[in-house]
């Protein structure tokens, strides 16, 4: 739990850097603290030579899929490949643990991130209305075994994202 507190403080400072974009984030962390304690939700710290450059949060949602709740790279560390490298490492870890899918959502206007997902072969399969941000977000999925079972992907997306609708 000490490690979680340190990471939680780091997320608070990250939230302060994005003030206005993620004002609800530290409250969300506190509300979901139990899921961090039981291991269904994990925060990874992104490092470069021991220096924290950002964070990634994963929610192990079901036996079949994990939901990447966010990849946050400090503004002064962006556009250096940290998010992409972290995603690649997490996808390998999920595959080794026999997960089928990794889901992620991002703001529609975040074209750079959508391009990164597509370059890693995520499929943008629909949208989710984000009730806190009051806007639609893209929902993308990575099929770890490349089976391309879109019916299953859509069904799982509906379970993970209450406001999900297909493209």
Can you say where each PLM-predicted feature lies in the sequence?
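Conserved active-site alpha-helix within GNAT-family acetyltransferase domains
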Residues: 84, 108-126
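Conserved acetyl-CoA pyrophosphate-binding loop and the N-cap/start of the following alpha-helix
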Residues: 77, 81-89
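Conserved GNAT acetyl-CoA-binding A-motif
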Residues: 94-106
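C-terminal "cap" of GNAT-fold acetyltransferases
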Residues: 130-167
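Conserved catalytic-core motifs of GNAT/GCN5-like acyltransferases
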Residues: 105-106, 121-139
């Amino acid at each position: 739990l000490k490690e979680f507190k340190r990471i939680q403080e780091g997320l608070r400072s990250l939230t302060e850097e994005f003030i206005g974009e993620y004002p609800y984030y530290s409250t969300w962390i506190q509300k979901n603290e139990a899921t961090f304690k039981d291991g269904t939700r994990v925060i990874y710290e992104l490092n470069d030579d021991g220096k924290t450059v950002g964070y990634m949060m994963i929610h192990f949602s079901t036996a079949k899929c994990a939901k990447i709740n966010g990849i946050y790279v400090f503004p002064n560390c962006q556009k250096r490949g940290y998010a992409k490298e972290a995603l690649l490492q997490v996808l390998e870890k999920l595959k080794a643990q026999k997960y089928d899918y990794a889901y992620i959502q991002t703001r529609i206007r975040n074209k750079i991130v959508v391009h990164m997902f597509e370059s890693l072969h995520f499929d943008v399969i629909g949208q989710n209305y984000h009730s806190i941000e009051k806007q639609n977000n893209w929902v993308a999925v990575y099929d770890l075994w490349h089976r391309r079972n879109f019916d299953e992907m859509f069904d799982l997306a509906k379970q993970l994202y209450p406001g999900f609708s297909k493209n």
